[in-house]
Regions:
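Cytosolic juxtamembrane helix at the C-terminal end of the final transmembrane segment
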Residues: 124-147
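Membrane-water interface of transmembrane alpha-helices
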Residues: 53-65, 128-131
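Conserved catalytic or regulatory cores that recognize and/or transform ribose-phosphate-containing ligands
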Residues: 5-6, 39, 43-45, 138-142
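Membrane-interfacial segments
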Residues: 61-65, 99, 103-107, 134-142
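Hydrophobic alpha-helical transmembrane segments in multi-pass membrane proteins
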Residues: 18-56, 79-127
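Amphipathic, cytosolic membrane-interfacial segments at TM-TM junctions
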Residues: 63-82, 137-145
Length: 147
């Protein structure tokens, strides 16, 4: 059977945009790592930290500038990391609130530990996504983002 290949044209990005993408990964990483150094969880520090929020705003503003380059995949990767982390944190909060009404021993000994484990797992996932994306950027490669 013949193999079908699809070749897409990707233009080389300007160096300033590559540098900007490194800065955005650094901002996300800084916010996430603050969760290790403070009483906050990694994921809450990542989502509520000013550097991460500013990085997301810049991602949205500069999205058109990177369209058609391999940096487009990195911008999508960063936005999806933030968006999915926020979504899962909201889901976790809703589950905890649902289990927590009324406040019982079950909530304290079952719901809260589940939420803590979930928040730690989500934080590890955020760190993984930042590291994987940044390493691909260092190599000058796009990130595979499902459509």
């Amino acid at each position: 059977m013949a193999e079908i290949t699809v070749e897409t044209r990707v233009s080389a990005p300007r160096q300033s945009l590559v540098t900007l993408t490194h800065v955005l990964y650094a901002m996300h990483a800084f916010s996430a790592l603050m969760g290790l150094l403070t009483p906050a969880f990694i994921v809450t520090s990542f989502l509520a930290g000013w550097p991460s929020i500013i990085a997301v705003i810049v991602n949205l503003i500069k999205r058109d500038d990177v369209r058609g380059t391999y940096l487009e995949s990195h911008f999508s990767w960063q936005l999806r990391t933030f968006g999915y982390a926020l979504l899962w944190l909201v889901v976790m909060f809703l589950v905890l609130v649902t289990l927590g009404i009324p406040l019982t021993l079950v909530t304290l000994f079952v719901g809260l530990p589940i939420a803590v484990v979930f928040a730690i797992g989500l934080g590890i996932w955020v760190l993984y996504r930042i590291a994987r994306g940044w390493l691909a950027l260092i190599e000058g490669k796009p990130i595979r983002v499902p459509s």
